[in-house]
């Protein structure tokens, strides 16, 4: 039985072709630690880890590979920045499209006299740029923005927001969970102080690895969330300040970093623009096929230029969870349903509390997958109308 995987916004599947073999080779043949052993095999693995930092720094046009830090995921990265930067009395601005990876740590900090206000977005998820300056207070220290919505794919204008941040001397923190490896991100051009990303989505690596790219100023301003052994300055009982050690305590997830390196190599070989154009072509075909179907509501932007390859829908008269269940059980199509860990985004989009059915395309999907999804939706809508008509009679 062939399944069609359309949940790439959750995690890309399949991964880049050499990810699994590279991870297996490391575990089987070179499964040693780095920054600990003074032997050749350790140095060989260190070279791979450094190459991965270089690739990430180049991809995002960061300031220095030493300021590329590995974490377990984007949620950890955001927590490290949010909980390491803000102090009592600070005020933060966020958008109304933020994920719980931002909302929950910020809500925890309310108990520490750290407050936040929400920059409104319209019903397509686009931030209202002209509303930002009126929300800035004397004690505002940062703006945190979800680069692209995991609910509807709407892309925010990070370059313009970065300009506003610099004009008001604010830190600019970007959640790039849905855009890293998918579309160009220029840390310098967009004046981003902290870019938080995950490795298992657009970067085509395994689950369990993420990271953050910091400016030198941001790295100096942060208090490390986790302290421990680094393999350097071991005579000190305080954390070293050299980078990247200051934010990488304990044993790194070396198998997953090596897998991420393979994902990055695949993106380099295929070309990120080529992968992105393929995914957007699938998205455009899907949107074109959805528009004539009476009863289907497309959430967010109506064109591909302003969105990622993520499409959320609702169906008149049909429960979202039931639609997703039928897609999987009858048509073997895997999607994501519900609130997507982003209730504020759904409130903004008008889809709270039920949520949506989300389709998200990846590099391995085909136009045949799109056709299968559209065919299934046609049948589901037809059946929904038939049931509704029978009920009315």
Language-model regions, residue ranges each:
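Pyridoxal 5′-phosphate
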Residues: 1-388
